[in-house]
Amino acid sequence: GAMARRRFIPIHDRGRVLIDLAVMLADGGESISDIGVLRHQSEALGPVASAPTVWRTLNEVTAGKRKKIQVARARTRRHVWSHLPGGVPASKCAGRDLGATIVLDVDATIVVTHSEKEHAAPTYKRTFGYHPIGVWCDNTTEFLAASLRPGNAGSNTAADHIDVLGQAIAQ
C-alpha cells in the first residue's frame, strides 16, 4: 500500500486508519478525537485506531506517500468508472447533455478561523482564515483535488488554478 514502511508492521494498517479518518469526517466529525465515535460501529468497520495513532499516521504522510495515495486514488477511480453502467454520467449545461465530456468544477471559498492558525491570514471580506480552492468532477460529484491557501490569496490567481487543475486532471 501507499502507506507501507519496510520492516514495520503496525497494529492498525495506516491505509485503514486514513479510511477511518475519511469515514469520521463524512459522519460529521470535526476533530481527530471524534475518531472514537467509530468504535461504536466496530462490527461494521472493524477495529478503529485511537486518536494518537491517527496523529502518528498523519505525521507519516510524506510528499512521496501523498503521491502514492494520489496514484492509488486515480487507479481506483478509473476502475470504478470503467464498471459504471453506461459509463460516466453526462453533465448538463444550460439544459444540454454534454455526453462523454468530463466537466471539472473549480471553486474557492473563505473558511473563517477564530484564532491565528498556521497559514491563516486576513481575507478580502475583512475576516481571518483560509481561501482554499477545490476541484470536483461535475459528472459524478466526486472531490478531486484542493489547495489550502491563506485567506489573503487572490480569487483569480492563475498559478493556483493551474496547479489545482493539474492535480485534478491527474486523478
Model features per residue range: what roles?
Residues 1-154, 158-171:
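Dynamic "connector" segments at or just before major functional cores
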